[in-house]
Each structure stands twice: as structure tokens, then as C-alpha cells.
């Protein structure tokens, strides 16, 4: 029951992921970070089967960083998302497919604009203004549809994210231990340490 949310605003992308790691009715960890920094301006959040998510995320992170070192070139968020989509598409045709859904948020330095991509475990990729995986989509898409504007500032995006998290806390039968929120903009990736949904 992982929660990952992404919102693209005027000059950044905001990604939020639940802190809880659960198995059945047990909470195994209450401070898990379900994101990986793939490059200085690209962040991936992931949800899915416990073993698959971490293994896949580390594999993607290592390969993107290896490419950057070999070629001395930072891949754009679009190029990173295409690589991730290709790996998931290859995986689904193997004997041991990854059961991983991802959101990739980044800032393209050449185009000077933020980008958000949603990719599911079948290798379907789409660029969106906002996205969610897991049960979070059922409860938050109506809020996002109603309140989202492409010209929102980062602060307005964080306020919209607070509305979404409040709705999840009210509607979901489980405690997901809050969310870790990260912002990707022209200056890089930073974590929002004082994010409170109340």
C-alpha cells in the first residue's frame, strides 16, 4: 500500500512518497525513503513489491550514473524516463518481471522546464502535470483535477499536496506514517523537512 504522488508546477516538480513499509498488517519501517536520485536534476519515486522496488531502483540509479560518468553528460528527465520504460518493458517479457511503478520528476536544463513522467510495471510511459500510483490515485485525482493549475508556484503546489495528504489520512484505513516530500528544480533536488499535512 505504497503512496507516491507527483505534481509539476511552474518551475519545479514535487514528489511525495509514504514513509511506511508494511507487510500484511505489520509496519516494518516507519521512515523509508521511496525515492532515488538518478542525476543532479532527476528524481525517481517507486512503489510495488518490496524486493523488486529496491533492486530495480538501485539498478536504474547505477546505470544512469554509469552513463553520466562514461559520457560526461547528464541525461535529461525525458531520456532517463525512456531508459526506465525500456527496462520495465524488457522485464515484463522475462521470466522474473519487476512489479514496480514509478514517477520520474526532473528539471530539463536545456529546455528550462520541469517534467513529470508516470511509468507503470507494464512499461507504459506518459508525461503528466500530476500523477499517483497505488491507492493514492483513487482518493487524490479528483482534488488534483479540481485545484491544479499549470502556473502554480512551488508553495501553491505544496499547499495542494497538503490537501491530498489530508484526504489520504482521512480516507485510507491504514496509517502510512506521513510522507517524505522532495522538490526538483533548476538548482537540483532538495527535501522539504518541515512538511506537515495538518
Swiss-Prot record:
<keyword id="KW-0597">Phosphoprotein</keyword>
<dbReference type="InterPro" id="IPR016050">
    <property type="entry name" value="Proteasome_bsu_CS"/>
</dbReference>
<dbReference type="InterPro" id="IPR023333">
    <property type="entry name" value="Proteasome_suB-type"/>
</dbReference>
<dbReference type="InterPro" id="IPR001353">
    <property type="entry name" value="Proteasome_sua/b"/>
</dbReference>
<dbReference type="GO" id="GO:0019774">
    <property type="term" value="C:proteasome core complex, beta-subunit complex"/>
</dbReference>
<dbReference type="GO" id="GO:0000502">
    <property type="term" value="C:proteasome complex"/>
</dbReference>
<dbReference type="InterPro" id="IPR029055">
    <property type="entry name" value="Ntn_hydrolases_N"/>
</dbReference>
<dbReference type="GO" id="GO:0061133">
    <property type="term" value="F:endopeptidase activator activity"/>
</dbReference>
<comment type="function">
    <text>Non-catalytic component of the proteasome which degrades poly-ubiquitinated proteins in the cytoplasm and in the nucleus. It is essential for the regulated turnover of proteins and for the removal of misfolded proteins. The proteasome is a multicatalytic proteinase complex that is characterized by its ability to cleave peptides with Arg, Phe, Tyr, Leu, and Glu adjacent to the leaving group at neutral or slightly basic pH. It has an ATP-dependent proteolytic activity. This subunit has a chymotrypsin-like activity.</text>
</comment>
<keyword id="KW-0647">Proteasome</keyword>
<feature type="modified residue" description="Phosphoserine">
    <location>
        <position position="76"/>
    </location>
</feature>
<protein>
    <recommendedName>
        <fullName>Proteasome subunit beta type-4</fullName>
    </recommendedName>
</protein>
<dbReference type="Pfam" id="PF00227">
    <property type="entry name" value="Proteasome"/>
</dbReference>
<dbReference type="GO" id="GO:0005634">
    <property type="term" value="C:nucleus"/>
</dbReference>
<feature type="modified residue" description="N-acetylmethionine">
    <location>
        <position position="1"/>
    </location>
</feature>
<dbReference type="GO" id="GO:0005829">
    <property type="term" value="C:cytosol"/>
</dbReference>
<dbReference type="GO" id="GO:0043161">
    <property type="term" value="P:proteasome-mediated ubiquitin-dependent protein catabolic process"/>
</dbReference>
<comment type="subunit">
    <text>The 26S proteasome consists of a 20S proteasome core and two 19S regulatory subunits. The 20S proteasome core is composed of 28 subunits that are arranged in four stacked rings, resulting in a barrel-shaped structure. The two end rings are each formed by seven alpha subunits, and the two central rings are each formed by seven beta subunits. The catalytic chamber with the active sites is on the inside of the barrel.</text>
</comment>
<dbReference type="InterPro" id="IPR035206">
    <property type="entry name" value="Proteasome_beta2"/>
</dbReference>
<keyword id="KW-0007">Acetylation</keyword>
<keyword id="KW-0963">Cytoplasm</keyword>
<dbReference type="GO" id="GO:0005789">
    <property type="term" value="C:endoplasmic reticulum membrane"/>
</dbReference>
<keyword id="KW-0539">Nucleus</keyword>
<dbReference type="GO" id="GO:0010499">
    <property type="term" value="P:proteasomal ubiquitin-independent protein catabolic process"/>
</dbReference>
<comment type="similarity">
    <text>Belongs to the peptidase T1B family.</text>
</comment>
Amino acid at each position: 500500500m505504497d503512496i507516491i504522488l507527483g505534481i509539476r508546477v511552474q518551475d519545479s516538480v514535487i514528489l511525495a512518497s509514504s514513509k511506511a513499509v508494511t507487510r500484511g498488517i505489520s509496519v516494518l519501517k516507519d521512515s523509508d525513503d521511496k525515492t532515488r536520485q538518478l542525476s543532479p536534476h532527476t528524481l525517481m519515486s517507486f512503489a510495488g513489491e518490496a524486493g523488486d522496488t529496491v533492486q530495480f531502483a538501485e539498478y536504474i540509479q547505477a546505470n544512469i550514473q554509469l552513463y553520466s560518468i562514461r559520457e560526461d553528460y547528464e541525461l535529461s528527465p525525458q531520456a532517463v524516463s525512456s531508459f526506465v520504460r525500456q527496462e520495465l518493458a524488457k522485464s515484463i517479457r522475462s521470466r522474473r518481471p519487476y512489479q514496480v511503478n514509478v514517477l520520474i520528476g526532473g528539471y530539463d536544463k536545456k529546455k528550462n522546464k520541469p517534467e513529470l513522467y508516470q511509468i507503470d510495471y507494464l512499461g507504459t510511459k506518459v508525461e503528466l502535470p500530476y500523477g499517483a500510483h497505488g491507492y493514492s490515485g483513487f482518493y487524490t485525482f479528483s482534488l488534483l483535477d479540481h485545484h491544479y493549475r499549470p502556473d502554480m508556484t512551488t508553495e501553491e503546489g505544496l499547499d495542494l499536496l497538503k490537501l491530498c495528504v489530508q484526504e489520504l489520512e482521512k480516507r485510507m484505513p491504514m496509517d502510512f506514517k506521513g510522507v517524505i516530500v522532495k522538490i526538483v528544480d533548476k538548482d537540483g533536488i532538495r527535501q522539504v523537512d518541515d512538511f506537515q499535512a495538518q
